C-alpha cells in the first residue's frame, strides 16, 4: 500500500500531460490559437483525458502485478515521468503541433517495446546502459528533472507561473486565462491568478512540508487537497466553470465510481510512416535510450536497496525477467494509447516498509486495478493541482547532479550541455545528442593530442576523469544465454552453486599478491575462512 500511495499521482499527472497532445482529435491547421477556444475540440481532448486515466491505471496494474509475479521484485511500473512529457510536448506537440501525429508516436512506442525486449534477451541492453559515460547518464536524469519543472511551472499542465514573452524567451506570468493576451500576461495582471496561489501553497508548500516529515502519500495528499478546493462550482478557483465544457466535465465527475471504457486511444496506432520517417526514427531512438537508462537505473537502485545485487556482475536475480516484463508492458501500453512505461523510484516506499518480494508489487498492482473504477475522480484533477508535483519530482531527480564529475571538464561540459539543452529546447533527444557529441569531440581531441605528442600534451587532471569501458563484468551475454551456451538444459534456472570453479580460482590469492584483511580496522572479530571443499 505504501508504494501505491507514493505513486498514485501518476494516474492524474500522466493523463493531464498526455491529453495536452490532443491525442487523435483533429485541430484545423488554420485555427488561430491552436484550438484553445474550440469547444468541440476541447471536449474531444477531455475524452482523451478520461481514456488516459483508465489506460494509465490499467497498464500500471498489469505491469506492476506481473513484475511481482514473474520477476519477484518489489518494483512498480507505470508511464514514465519525463518520457510522457517528451511524448506529449515534443513528439506529438501541444494539440498535435509537434513532429508526428499521435497515432504514429504510439507506433514508435510499440516498436520500441519489442526492440527493448530483443536487446534484453541478447544482453545488448546491459551493454548499452554501461557503454554511455557516467556523467551523461547522471546528467540525463537531471535534465529530465528540469524539463518536468518547466512543465509544472507553465500553463498547459502546471500552475501558470511562467509564460512566453516578446523580448525574452520566458517571463513571470501568473494571470488568469481570461487576461492572457496571445499567451502572455499583461504586467498589471501578473501573479494574480487564484488557481496559481492555491497550487503553490496547498500543492507545493504543504506537500514539501509533508515530504520533509516523511509523511506517507505526501504527494497524493497535496493533489487531493487542491482538487477538493477546486471542485465546488461557484468559486474563483473552480475546475468546472458554467460553460458547455465545464458542464460536461462536471457531469462525468458526479458519477464518482464507474468504469470508463477506452474509446479514442485504444488501438490507435498508424503504420503508414510516409513523410514522417526521420521524425519517427528520432522519437523511437529517444524512447529506447531513455527507457534503457531509466529502467536499468531504477531497477538497479531498487534491487540494491532491497539487498539483492551481485557485487561481481552488478546484476540481480530476476533482472532478465524484470526487463522483459517492462518491455512487453511498453508495447501493451501503446495499444492502450499511453507513453512508454518505466520502473518508479517510489517503489522504495514499499521496500522501506519491509517489502522485499514480488508480493509487494502484486498488492500495488491490485490497488491500481481498483483505481480503474474511480476514473471520474482522477479525470477531474486540475493541472494546477499537479503542477507543483512536477516541480517536486524534478527536484528529486536533480539530486543526481551532485554525483557528476565536475572536476574534469571532459566529463563536466558534456554533462552540463545535456542538462541545459533538455529544458531550453523542450526536448530530451536534443539534450542527449548535445551531450554525447560534445563528449566524443572533447575526449577525441584529448586522445589525438596525447597520442600525437607521445604523452607530452595531457590535461593536468586527466587522472580525475571518470573511468569508461565498453566491457561488462560477468560477460557480454546475459546469464541465461551463458548457461545455454554451456549446454545447461534448464538454462532458464539460476545456477545453484554460489561460486563456480573459475570464480573460486579468481578469489584465491595469487603468487606475489598481498591480501589485506579490512576487518583489522573494524570492531568486529575476524572470522576464519572456510576451507575450499576438496574434489
Task: Tell where the protein language model's regions lie, with residue ranges.
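Helix-loop-helix junctions within the multi-pass membrane cores of secondary transporters/permeases
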Residues: 1-10, 31-39, 54, 59-60, ...
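Helix-loop-helix hairpins and the membrane-proximal interhelical loops
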Residues: 1-50, 185-186, 223-320
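Transmembrane helix-loop junctions in multipass membrane proteins, especially transporters and channels
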Residues: 19, 72-76, 124-125, 159, ...
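Transmembrane alpha-helix interface/packing and boundary motifs in multi-pass membrane proteins
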Residues: 64-75, 209-214, 286-294, 327-336, ...
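Conformational gate/switch positions in structured elements
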Residues: 75-77, 218, 295, 338, ...
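Membrane-embedded alpha-helical modules
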Residues: 93-225, 362-496
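Alpha-helical membrane-protein architecture signal
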Residues: 202, 281-285, 317, 321-328, ...
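Intrinsically disordered, low-complexity cytosolic terminal tails
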Residues: 478-535
